[in-house]
Amino acid sequence: ATGTPEPVAANAPEIVTTTDLRVWFPITRGLMRRTVGHIKAVNAATLSVRAGETLGIVGESGSGKTTLALAIMRLIASQGPVMFMGRDVQGLHSRDMRPLRRDMQIVFQDPYGSLSPRMTVEQIVAEGLAVHGVGRADRRAQVAEILTEVGLDPLMMDRYPHEFSGGQRQRIAIARAMILRPKLVVLDEPTSALDMTVQVQIVDLLRDLQRRHAIAYLFISHDLKVVRALSHKVIVMRN
């Protein structure tokens, strides 16, 4: 991947900040399941990401990169404040988290594994809209719009994932995340399953979407070239 990210606006608001965030998994022993220690998957992570900014998260396998991102999104339990758009979401009930979910999205490494083979592109991309109560007619129009934005022909929306190439499937996964116009998107190795030419295209697309919509990215990768092309700042996680 080549190029560099767009500069972040001087007045860009903070989207997410953490202070000494921890994810510790208990080690239990015996019949009473007594806790005898902890696996410290993430220990004292302090970070901040502003609108239109990308934080690259690098580290070897098992260093806690994805665990950190899932904790920020409140998809796994953690300790320590997580401020999202000025609000501490750490103690929020799932009912109170639900309205915030549309502002936090994720794009996974394997586009084929994350797309249901039994659903059409329209159904896949519109899934979030349906959850948040958008009507069918509006959903189809919004799917057409976002498919165009990610470089796919809206006439393809009635097809199934197996009819697309790996790069096209990743564009579908990106469209699914972006259709809700989120403030924060976690990109979990989104280019690692793609060949070099397609990687460059996907990085260009992600940069373009960020520039247009001032999205904050948490970009997880082990590929430093791609990290440099997309990230404004980088944290390194170690075992």
Please place each PLM-identified region on the residue numbering.
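A short, proline-enriched helix->beta-strand linker immediately N-terminal to the Walker B motif
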Residues: 179-183
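Conserved ABC transporter NBD signature motif
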Residues: 80-88
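Conserved ABC ATPase "signature" region
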Residues: 88, 137-155
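ABC ATPase NBD coupling module
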Residues: 31-36, 89-105, 131, 136
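Conserved ABC ATPase signature
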Residues: 160-164, 168
